[in-house]
C-alpha cells in the first residue's frame, strides 16, 4: 500500500507500532468506527492514533517524490519538520539527502535553506561540499543556515570554512560561526575573536566572543 511517500506492507505488521496499524488502516479508507471494531480497541484510542499519524506523516502523505517532499518541508512549521525527520525511515532519509546532493545547485534560495537545515539536523558529513559553498552564498539566510548546520555536525574539518566566515559582513552569521567554533572545539580562532570583540559595540556579539574565549582559555 502506498500513500504519497508512505509505503507499507501488511506482511511486516509485527514491526508496526499500535499507532501505525491504526493509521495505515485509516489510509486504506477505513473509518474510525470500523478500525475500532477490527482492532477491538476504543474509538477514542483509534482517534488518537490517527491524529498522531496525521501529525507525523502528513508531509510524506502529500509528497509523491523527493522534490515534492522538499517543497512540503520548506512550507511547514519547524516542529512539524522536526517530527518528520525524527520519524522518517533511514532509507527515506538517504533518498532525500541523495536528492539534495544532486539538485542543490539548481534550487531556489528558500529550498537551499531547507536543504541545508535538513543536512544539519541529520548531521550528514557527506554533504560537506554543499555546506562549504553555502557558507559563502550571496543570501544571508543561506549562509546563516550553513554555519548553523556546520555547528550541529561537529566536524573539525570545517575549521578553515568557519575561520573565513568570521569575516562575514553580517553580524548574525558571525555569531553563528563563533557558536559553531565552540561546538566543534576549534581553538585556532582566538586572535580573530579578540579583534571582533574589540571592534563591536553589540552585546550579543561580545557575549559570543567571551563564551568562546572562556572555553579556549580553560
Where are these regions (language model features)?
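Short, Lys/Arg-enriched anionic-surface-contact patches
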Residues: 1-18, 60-61, 107, 111
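Short, solvent-exposed alpha-helical "recognition" segments
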Residues: 13-14, 47-65
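Structural detector for internal amphipathic alpha-helices that build alpha-solenoid repeat scaffolds
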Residues: 20-24, 37-38, 48-57, 71, ...
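Short inter-helical turns and helix N-cap capping residues of alpha-solenoid HEAT/ARM repeat scaffolds
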Residues: 74-77, 107-108, 138-139, 169-170, ...
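Key DNA-contact positions within bacterial/archaeal DNA-binding proteins
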Residues: 44
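Amphipathic alpha-helical scaffolding segments comprising HEAT/armadillo-like alpha-solenoid repeats
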Residues: 59-72, 91-105, 124-136, 155-167, ...
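Short, amphipathic alpha-helical "recognition" segments used to contact nucleic acids or chromatin
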Residues: 14-29
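Helix-turn-helix DNA-binding elements, focusing on the entry/boundary residues of the two helices
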Residues: 32
Amino acid at each position: 500500500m502506498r500513500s504519497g511517500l508512505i509505503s507499507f506492507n501488511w506482511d511486516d505488521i509485527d514491526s508496526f507500532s499500535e499507532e501505525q496499524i491504526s493509521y495505515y488502516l485509516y489510509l486504506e479508507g477505513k473509518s474510525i468506527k470500523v478500525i475500532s471494531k477490527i482492532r477491538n480497541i476504543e474509538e477514542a484510542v483509534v482517534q488518537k492514533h490517527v491524529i498522531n499519524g496525521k501529525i507525523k506523516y502528513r508531509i510524506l502523505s502529500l509528497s509523491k517524490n523527493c522534490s515534492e517532499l522538499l517543497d512540503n518541508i520548506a512550507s511547514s512549521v519547524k516542529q512539524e519538520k522536526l517530527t518528520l525527520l525524527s520519524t522518517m525511515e533511514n532509507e527515506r532519509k538517504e533518498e532525500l539527502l541523495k536528492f539534495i546532493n544532486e539538485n542543490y545547485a539548481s534550487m531556489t534560495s528558500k529550498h537551499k535553506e531547507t536543504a541545508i537545515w535538513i543536512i544539519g539536523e541529520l548531521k550528514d558529513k557527506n554533504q560537506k561540499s554543499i555546506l562549504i559553498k553555502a557558507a559563502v552564498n550571496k543570501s544571508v539566510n543561506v549562509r546563516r543556515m550553513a554555519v548553523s548546520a556546520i555547528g550541529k555536525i561537529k566536524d573539525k574539518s570545517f575549521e578553515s570554512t568557519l575561520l573565513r566566515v568570521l569575516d562575514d559582513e553580517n553580524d548574525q552569521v558571525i555569531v553563528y560561526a563563533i557558536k559553531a567554533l565552540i561546538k566543534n572545539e576549534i581553538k585556532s580562532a582566538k586572535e580573530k575573536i579578540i579583534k571582533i570583540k574589540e571592534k563591536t559595540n553589540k552585546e550579543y556579539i561580545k557575549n559570543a566572543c567571551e563564551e568562546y574565549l572562556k572555553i579556549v582559555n580553560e
